[in-house]
């Protein structure tokens, strides 16, 4: 399955994928399509962000952005969301990581980051790809 940069016409499909991702993650807060749409638009408009999709009719989405590390470690890329439908997982997902890393390099990033949810731990995949754990985040409802 080919990986490509999203087009504006992919918006509705990407929002649908974000809904699927939200459900798969088991989030307890409601999905907001308007918020997902804004997220897509923001990433599409920023020269320091990307929206990658896999398949002509998108079966996966990876959004990321690049920024200067707050402690001066250089420009870094950070994944915002990565979701691939169950039927499209496998080699297509790996191609998305390849494309993300290439995009990060193209905008001058010295490193790229990925996240792994507690409800869907894919850290072993990242480690096989050369990523290493650097920080663990905790959330507390307020």
Language-model segments: which ranges?
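A short beta-loop-alpha structural element at the N-terminal edge
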Residues: 1-16
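Conserved GNAT-fold acetyl-CoA-binding loop/helix
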Residues: 19-40
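A short, internal acetyl-CoA/4′-phosphopantetheine-binding micro-motif in the GNAT/acyltransferase core
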Residues: 80-90
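Conserved beta-strand-loop-alpha-helix junction that forms the acyl-donor binding cleft
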Residues: 112-123, 142
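A short helix-loop-beta-strand connector motif used in the catalytic cores of GNAT acetyltransferases and
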Residues: 41-52
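A conserved beta-turn-beta hairpin within the catalytic core of GNAT-like acetyltransferases
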Residues: 68-79
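Conserved acetyl-CoA-binding loop-helix of GNAT-fold acetyltransferases
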Residues: 89-102
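Conserved beta-strand in the GNAT
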Residues: 57-66
